[in-house]
A protein has these predicted regions:
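Conserved small/polar residues in nucleotide/adenosyl-binding loops
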Residues: 209-215
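Catalytic adenosine-cofactor/nucleotide-binding cores of aminoacyl-tRNA synthetases and other
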Residues: 16-107, 204-208
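Secondary-structure transition/capping motifs at alpha-helix termini
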Residues: 2-10, 129, 189
Length: 216
């Protein structure tokens, strides 16, 4: 770079080792897990998620087929997949897929909004420090909070009383907006998954710089 009179990098990210069963992967040991095999079995985004999530900034990462399957089932299928499916199913069942903001709010809504706002700031902070695993964990913590929000607001109970119709709409609106913002944050890590979420929710794709919840 100096010979070409090009600027030198101001920081270099040196990632840790990726271990298989506690040992460094080696062809001679026959313990290598190939990315192509993971992609064939789980897809590109799931492979991205595992590698990013399991390689913290300062520690060696550990990979086993058992752990890959566990992450796929627990994080991608259960936490994220079920959240999106539940939200879409309820929106379709109760409002034909079209939810709106009604202004019938509760304290739990403000807590969810605070988590959404805090997640965007946390992701930015972690990425500035090259802590990619922490950043993606923060996004999934938001999805966990959304799942908890469903349990707290019990939309299926609200649906039984016509008087709670507007409250039900507000709950599903908050969920849809929060998941959409979460998908926007996720896009840098799992682009295909994020786009699928936005398309399934039938919402407008959001840019990273505009990931905020409406105040009115």
């Amino acid at each position: 770079l100096m010979a070409l009179d090009l600027p030198l990098p101001k920081q270099v990210f040196g990632h840790p080792w990726l271990l298989q069963g506690g040992d460094k992967m080696s062809k001679s040991k026959g313990n290598v897990i190939y990315a192509d095999d993971m992609v064939r079995l789980f897809g590109v985004d799931a492979t991205r998620y595992f590698v990013l999530h399991e390689m913290p900034f300062e520690n060696d990462g550990v990979i086993t087929w058992e752990l890959v399957i566990e992450r796929f089932n627990s994080d991608l299928a259960n936490i994220l997949g079920n959240l999106v499916n539940r939200t879409i199913s309820m929106s379709n069942k109760y409002f034909d897929g079209v939810v709106r903001k009604t202004g019938v709010t509760a304290e739990v809504d403000e807590d969810l909004k605070a988590v959404v706002t805090g997640t965007r700031d946390k992701v930015q902070e972690k990425m500035d420090k090259l802590r990619v695993a922490d950043a993606i964990t923060a996004v999934f913590d938001l999805f966990r909070r959304c799942n908890k929000y469903i349990d707290e607001t019990t939309p299926w109970v609200l649906a039984k009383d016509e008087a709670d119709h507007d409250r039900l709409a507000e709950v599903l609106y908050n969920l849809t907006e929060s998941i959409t913002i979460g998908a926007g944050l996720l896009h840098s890590f799992l682009p295909e998954t994020a786009e699928k979420i936005v398309n399934q929710l039938n919402t407008t794709s959001v840019s990273y710089t505009h990931l905020t919840l409406p105040t009115t």
